[in-house]
Design a protein with these regions (language model features):
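C-terminal beta-sandwich/jelly-roll accessory domains of carbohydrate-active enzymes
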Residues: 64-141, 450
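Conserved, well-structured interaction surfaces
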Residues: 1-7, 12-22
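Non-catalytic, well-ordered alpha-helical segments in soluble enzyme domains
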Residues: 17-35
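Kelch-like beta-propeller repeat domains
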Residues: 142-493
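Generic recognition of long tandem-repeat/solenoid scaffolds
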Residues: 55-60, 96-102, 288
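Surface beta-strand/loop "capping" patches
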Residues: 31-73
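Mature catalytic domains of secreted/periplasmic carbohydrate-active enzymes
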Residues: 6, 20-23, 39-43, 93
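Flexible loop/turn segments at secondary-structure boundaries
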Residues: 8-12, 65-67, 119-121, 411, ...
């Protein structure tokens, strides 16, 4: 492509000075037709745009050395929340791409550059070749974060629990936010040989429009437990598997709330112990996948029909590839409108038969076809793979899956390989837990980073969705160190 927009005139869009246009045609021909790879063929050509954190991050082909041609601030960029309502925007170079923003526009969804018959647009590359004009809209499937709030209040009657837990069970029951179980190292840190403590108390809190949660102890689980799966249903919260100080568990419980008290019902047990797995509800069927099956990392996949409990848990075809402990999952419609089970990430410690593994790819299970199909690797805004192992995920709208949290793939894999003897002793920042909020579009089969929120950089958090609010509950900031924080992400409808 040869750019001529910078050679126009306010009264005549056709260039009077033809020489620069001819030279640019020559550069293009030398590179593309005659193979002179050392000749830059064009000015910056739009490649992609990431709409996140109140700005648009634009990358270009032939974009090395981005600058203004005249040394003045970059101009002719505009952004808008709604098509047709554009405002001029500031553009600055960051890491060889452009950050474009207007402080009056909180969530830009459209961007354009030099979008007039005559423009004084001044973006060039290192060769001084002008950038092409462009206009781009954010994907219609994009999620817009309205606000991020830190909820105030966490159960205080047990001073050990009050320090925050990891891997608790959580959900919505009778309109209340409920948490149960979980574990932490309340006295001595794990790196100093501290013992992990498991809990069995059940707490509930009313949800209101403010950020204050007033917790009440509503009862107890039949035993202390953590590291299982919990899902909210119209008839209570289902808690599956997990483990405690004594053993891994095969139990399944349903927690209902009536008259401010938790009522726990025992449902059919799994045919094996299962902990550190993932799970999701597809209509009336609860699926769980991966985790440690009878103490070993697995590819296990089971289903319980909540309307036919007498049939118990049914074993389904295992997902392909390596075993996955602490993967993430969500139930969402596929491109054909069929409800499916989506699975990503997970890890497995080394054994005599296989090396340590940390997965960044995924699979989708179709109940209709009873088969697994590969999914794209989790990708961030610059095309790097991301681990969601230990993170959380939830379906959103009709074709999106929101994911957050999880360990850093490189650091954690080295820990699994036992190449870092001092792994447990570093400060929180060293572990680089994932702070991105990522969205997967099942129709486009694409990932998008919509925000970077340090408060969701956790592993072992619980995720609860209520209306437009997503609650990220507790979890660990680094191995062995829990947080009592509950972060609420409000999605703009």
């Amino acid at each position: 492509m040869v750019v001529s927009s910078d050679q126009g005139d306010s009264l005549d869009v056709h260039p009077i000075n033809k020489k620069p246009i001819g030279e640019r045609l020559g550069y293009w021909a030398l590179n593309r037709t005659y193979g002179y790879e050392n000749v830059l063929p064009s000015g910056p050509l739009f490649r992609s745009a990431e709409f996140r954190d109140g700005a648009v991050y634009v990358s270009f082909d032939y974009g090395d050395g981005l600058r203004s041609v005249d040394g003045a601030p970059l101009c002719a960029f505009e952004v808008a929340e709604e098509e047709g309502f554009y405002e001029l925007a500031t553009a600055i170079v960051e890491d060889n791409c452009l950050k474009v923003y207007n402080t009056n526009i909180k969530n830009p969804r459209f961007i354009r550059y030099g979008w007039q018959p005559f423009t004084r647009a001044n973006l060039v590359n290192k060769m001084g070749l002008s950038a092409s004009t462009f206009r781009v809209a954010a994907s219609a499937a994009c999620v817009i974060i309205d606000k991020v709030s830190q909820m105030q209040g966490f159960p205080q009657e047990n001073e050990n629990f009050a320090k925050g837990v990891s891997a608790c069970y959580a959900g919505i029951a009778a309109g209340k936010l409920l948490i149960a179980g979980g574990c932490n190292f309340p006295k001595i840190p794990v790196h100093a040989g501290g013992s992990k403590k498991y809990y069995r108390d059940i707490y509930t809190a009313e949800l209101s429009k403010d950020s204050v949660l007033v917790w009440q102890r509503a009862g107890q689980l039949p035993q202390a437990m953590a590291y299982g799966v919990s899902v909210s249903t119209a008839d209570g919260i289902i808690c599956v598997g997990g483990m405690n100080e004594q053993a891994a568990l095969s139990t399944t419980y349903r927690i209902r709330v009536a008259n401010e008290k938790a009522v726990v019902e025992t449902l059919p047990s799994l045919p094996c112990t299962l902990d550190n797995m993932t799970g999701a509800l597809l209509e009336n069927k609860l699926y769980v996948a991966g985790g440690n099956k009878d103490g070993k990392a697995s590819n296990a996949f089971y289903c319980l029909d909540l309307e036919q409990l007498s049939q118990g848990w049914q074993e389904l075809p295992a997902f392909p590839g390596v075993p996955r402990v602490q993967p993430v999952s969500a139930a969402q419609l596929d491109a054909d409108g069929q409800l499916c089970f989506y699975l990503w990430s997970g890890f497995a410690a080394p054994t005599e038969e296989r090396d340590a593994s940390l997965s960044v790819d995924g699979y989708v299970y179709s109940p209709a076809a009873n088969t697994w199909t590969p999914l794209p690797e989790v990708m961030d805004e610059v095309g790097e793979t991301v681990s969601l192992s230990g993170g959380v995920a939830t379906a959103w709208d009709k074709n999106l899956i929101i994911c957050m949290g999880g360990v850093d793939k490189d650091i954690f894999l080295r820990a699994l390989q036992k190449t870092a003897a001092d792994y447990l002793t570093h400060p929180v920042e060293w572990y680089r837990f994932n702070k991105r909020v990522l969205v997967y579009d099942v129709r486009l089969r694409e990932w998008q980073t919509i925000a970077c929120i340090p408060d969701v950089a956790r592993a072992g958090a619980a995720l609860v969705v209520c209306g437009e609010n997503i609650f990220c509950i507790n979890g660990e900031l680094k191995p062995g160190v829990r947080t009592p924080e509950i972060t609420c992400i409000t999605i703009k409808k």
